[in-house]
Amino acid sequence: METFLFTSESVNEGHPDKLCDQISDAVLDACLEQDPDSKVACETCTKTNMVMVFGEITTKATVDYEKIVRDTCRSIGFISDDVGLDADKCKVLVNIEQQSPDIAQGVHGHFTKRPEDIGAGDQGHMFGYATDETPELMPLSHVLATKIGAKLTEVRKNGTCRWLRPDGKTQVTVEYYNDNGAMVPVRVHTVLISTQHDETVTNEEIARDLKEHVIKPIIPEKYLDDKTIFHLNPSGRFVIGGPDGDAGLTGRKIIIDTYGGWGAHGGGAFSGKDPTKVDRSGAYIVRQSAKSVVANGMARRALVQVSYAIGVPEPFSVFVDTYGTGLIPDKEILKIVKESFDFRPGMMTINLDLKRGGNGRFLKTAAYGHFGRDDPDFTWEVVKPLKWDKPQA
């Protein structure tokens, strides 16, 4: 059996880039909660002792940007300079302006267009991906890297590993077998964790705790063997972290947000963007499309692409590739996808209920992945029944 290795990485919520994603989405939630028609393009950057939110927002909502920044930093665990940022003492800069009137007239006609006539907020192409290798219909390498990162945060916050600090990165290499286009995981080849820690803990304690409290609960035993390699804090020291260690910026973790390097990516980030931005809503609808193709048994693996022009409601193109795993030809699956999903931005917003903010809805997406999550707020994860005729054996 010929196999190959594939690697996916993740970062947890205390990573500076992810901190910025979460602040941008917390701002989006606050705007949509009060005004579902808010037009939001919110960016965040951070470095030592400073967070800045900037961008274009048109909303009727009354939003305390500084409070959102401090609350988000605090909830992640940035409560002192020792851990990389102090939520209560850091400088918060705000530079928010209104959406460009040129964009507004072209996209939503200054709020006068009907939903079916709302144009895409920008040009671009987005990809959705699904694979039958996990119950989530997501790549195993990505799922494991992401869940290990989430577990790191869990054992930090519940006090199991008191030496942990907010920043951290994970990486998992999986050995795969290609079964006529479908991906079959064989074993976990390598696990890498680099996590921020306090001054008191030894490298031996770090390795022991990570294996016992983080890796064992997440990676199924069937994927681990005596050849699995563990790199646990290989640099030897990771005390300085968060914005104190590295600058952070919204939208720099787009592969972690999606499929861990599998499928494809059009390059657009998600966080801080309202649903007229097809970077986000377009990526959500094609995830639902690809997932539905696989969940309905039409293929074991699927990639769906959609593309747009600014101000134009109808997509320029829709593309489907099942990597040779389809039970019917890809052109027939494409026809079913186009008949079953409405790719116009205004209609995607309605069908996926993307104007509903509040309750940390979009904030939840900004750490540990936008896809493969079992949460009713992730409406794009709902499988749509597709009508098709299964070929007779």
Swiss-Prot record:
Pathway: Amino-acid biosynthesis; S-adenosyl-L-methionine biosynthesis; S-adenosyl-L-methionine from L-methionine: step 1/1. One of its GO terms (molecular function) is ATP binding. The keyword Transferase applies. Keywords: ATP-binding, Cobalt, Cytoplasm, Magnesium, Metal-binding, Nucleotide-binding, One-carbon metabolism, Potassium, Transferase. L-methionine binds at residues 56, 99, 246, 277. K(+) binds at residue 43. Its cofactor is Mn(2+); Mg(2+); Co(2+); K(+). ATP binds at residues 15, 167-169, 235-238, 246, 252-253, 269, 273, 277. The keyword Repressor does not apply. GO terms for biological process: one-carbon metabolic process; S-adenosylmethionine biosynthetic process. Mg(2+) binds at residue 9. It is found in: Cytoplasm. Gene3D superfamilies: 3.30.300.10. Its EC number is 2.5.1.6. Binds 2 divalent ions per subunit. The metal ions interact primarily with the substrate. Can utilize magnesium, manganese or cobalt (in vitro). Binds 1 potassium ion per subunit. The potassium ion interacts primarily with the substrate. GO terms for cellular component: cytoplasm. Homotetramer. Catalyzes the formation of S-adenosylmethionine from methionine and ATP. The reaction comprises two steps that are both catalyzed by the same enzyme: formation of S-adenosylmethionine (AdoMet) and triphosphate, and subsequent hydrolysis of the triphosphate. Belongs to the AdoMet synthase family. This is S-adenosylmethionine synthase 1. It comes from Brassica juncea. The lineage of its organism: Eukaryota, Viridiplantae, Streptophyta, Embryophyta, Tracheophyta. The gene is SAMS1.
